[in-house]
From Swiss-Prot:
Homodimer and monomer. In vivo most of the ribosomes are in complex with monomeric TF. Uncomplexed TF, however, is in a monomer-dimer equilibrium with approximately two thirds of TF existing in a dimeric state. PROSITE patterns: FKBP_PPIASE. InterPro entries: PPIase_dom_sf, PPIase_FKBP_dom, Trig_fac, Trigger_fac_C, Trigger_fac_C_sf, Trigger_fac_ribosome-bd_bac, Trigger_fac_ribosome-bd_sf, Trigger_fact/SurA_dom_sf. Residues 161-246 form the PPIase FKBP-type domain. The lineage of its organism: Bacteria, Pseudomonadati, Pseudomonadota, Gammaproteobacteria, Enterobacterales. One of its GO terms (cellular component) is cytoplasm. GO terms for molecular function: peptidyl-prolyl cis-trans isomerase activity; protein folding chaperone; ribosome binding. It comes from the Bacteria. Pfam families: FKBP_C (PF00254), Trigger_C (PF05698), Trigger_N (PF05697). This is Trigger factor. One of its GO terms (biological process) is cell division. Consists of 3 domains; the N-terminus binds the ribosome, the middle domain has PPIase activity, while the C-terminus has intrinsic chaperone activity on its own. The gene is tig. Keywords: Cell cycle, Cell division, Chaperone, Cytoplasm, Isomerase, Rotamase. Involved in protein export. Acts as a chaperone by maintaining the newly synthesized protein in an open conformation. Functions as a peptidyl-prolyl cis-trans isomerase.
């Protein structure tokens, strides 16, 4: 076997391989012997068909199969010998084959980039320092109560967190526009559902009042004909309601899985859940900064084959989320996923190099801890842990998560990490 390697462009490579004629003939004869042992031809017993007849009848197809097999095996031998690491599936380009002569073919493919990590010491990471305070727990309890609240009609003016029922008609330059009219429209104030100024124009009014408010559509509004336009909305305020929050009774508390129904038990459970969320949020915040710094410090070429593969993954995930099938997934425009796919490939290659250079392996104690942390959010953690322990694929996925964490920690060990005190709500709002 003769082998030559050339660079086509960037990460592109072409390997040209020549297989000696005698190697081909030896392989063909060997395969014909195997065929002769199995075939049945009228007039001959199984395994007793003369080789010339076997060759005459099956020689062409056997030779084609043998050439395909030799091309594949010789390519693998060649990349091992030349220490080449292909990325993605190779493309075989057969040459002209002539009986009794050497056979030359080429294989085109991309290789993984050679990554030499740099700039780790210049990466800047700000680690949030946060604790869950009693006030944070109080706020979360208020949120839980609001989620379970009922609405009670009131006579007073509209306030920030009330709910209103309105009829409205919108117009621009005196002309009504499509989608600008509704009857018995229920609007919970303070959720930012409407354009700026709409809710502010309703506050302070009482049920039974009719009035007009002036607003301006944002420049980024989805309807082209309304972008940046001044508009008037005629409002008929039909009903005003205020939240009626449930008391922290034993019955209410037990809805959240607190068996003893005590306020202290609920506060403890809420604090535990908030601290788990906080731990995850801090970890994600630090990780995202470390990875962002790693990507900015290391500009690498990316094999197109890996990007294409990642686009296919993202397409299928998108189709699954919206109830689509395999065919619909492949029809989604690649432009929707190209940037995200490239970034994921870059991050994977860089973290892979961190793992390689630091000789990292998944820490089984960390894997165990991650599973226990994840399981603690379920009603029966022991059942979840047991389910994971018996599922090889899930365990391998969790080992990959642990290994990625270890790689990020290796980056952080060299980065400039500073600490900044913040609050629970500030951090969570940054995550949203």
């Amino acid at each position: 076997m003769q082998v030559s390697v050339e660079t086509t462009q960037g990460l592109g490579r072409r390997v040209t391989i020549t297989i000696a004629a005698d190697s081909i003939e030896t392989a063909v004869k060997s395969e014909l012997v195997n065929v002769a042992k199995k075939v049945r031809i009228d007039g001959f017993r199984k395994g007793k068909v003369p080789m010339n007849i076997v060759a005459q009848r099956y020689g062409a197809s056997v030779r084609q199969d043998v050439l395909g097999d030799l091309m594949s095996r010789n390519f693998i031998d060649a990349i091992i010998k030349e220490k080449i690491n292909p990325a993605g599936a190779p493309t075989y380009v057969p040459g002209e084959y002539k009986l009794g002569e050497d056979f030359t073919y080429s294989v085109e493919f991309e290789v993984y980039p050679e990554v030499e990590l740099q700039g780790l010491e210049a990466i800047e990471v700000e680690k949030p320092i946060v604790e869950v305070t009693d006030a944070d727990v109080d706020g979360m309890l208020d949120t839980l109560r609001k989620q379970q609240a009922t609405w009670k009609e009131k006579d007073g003016a509209v306030e920030a967190e009330d709910r209103v029922t309105i009829d409205f008609t919108g117009s621009v330059d005196g002309e009504e526009f499509e989608g600008g009219k509704a009857s018995d429209f229920v609007l919970a104030m303070g959720q930012g559902r409407m354009i700026p100024g709409f809710e502010d124009g309703i506050k302070g009014h009482k049920a039974g009042e009719e009035f007009t408010i002036d607003v301006t559509f944002p420049e980024e509004y989805h309807a082209e004909n309304l972008k940046g336009k001044a508009a008037k909305f005629a409002i008929n305020l039909k009903k005003v309601e205020e939240r009626e929050l449930p008391e922290l009774t034993e019955e209410f508390i037990k809805r959240f899985g607190v068996e003893d129904g005590s306020v202290e038990g609920l506060r403890a459970e809420v604090r535990k859940n908030m601290e788990r969320e906080l731990k995850s949020a801090i970890r994600n915040r630090v990780k995202s900064q470390a990875i962002e710094g790693l990507v900015k410090a290391n500009d690498i070429d990316v094999p197109a084959a890996l990007i294409d593969s990642e686009i296919d993954v993202l397409r299928r995930q998108a189709a699954q989320r919206f109830g689509g099938n395999e065919k619909q997934a492949l029809e989604l425009p690649r432009e929707l996923f190209e940037e995200q796919a490239k970034r994921r490939v870059v991050v994977g290659l860089l973290l892979g190099e961190v793992i390689r250079t630091n000789e990292l392996k998944a820490d089984e104690e960390r894997v165990k801890g991650l599973i226990e942390e994840m399981a603690s959010a379920y009603e029966d953690p022991k059942e979840v842990i047991e389910f994971y322990s018996k599922n090889k694929e899930l365990m391998d996925n969790m080992r990959n998560v642990a290994l990625e964490e270890q790689a990020v920690e290796a980056v952080l060990a060299k980065a400039k990490v500073t600490e900044k005190e913040t609050t629970f709500n500030e951090l969570m709002n940054q995550q949203a």
